[in-house]
């Protein structure tokens, strides 16, 4: 599971 599965702000 990816911990940072969201684009950088």
UniProtKB/Swiss-Prot annotation:
Its main location: secreted. Keywords: Cytolysis, Secreted. GO terms for cellular component: extracellular region. Signal peptide: none annotated. Disulfide bonds: none annotated. May act to induce hypotension. Presents weak hemolytic activity at physiological concentrations (micromolar range), and weak lactate dehydrogenase (LDH) release from mast cells. Does not induce mast cell degranulation, and antimicrobial effects. In vivo, injection into mice induces increase in nociceptive sensibility and causes very reduced or no edema formation. It also causes no alteration in rearing (standing on hind limbs), and reduces locomotion, suggesting an increase in anxiety. The primary structure of this cryptide Pep-7 is identical to that of cryptide TyPep-8 from Tityus serrulatus (AC P84190). This is Cryptide Pep-7. It comes from Tityus obscurus.
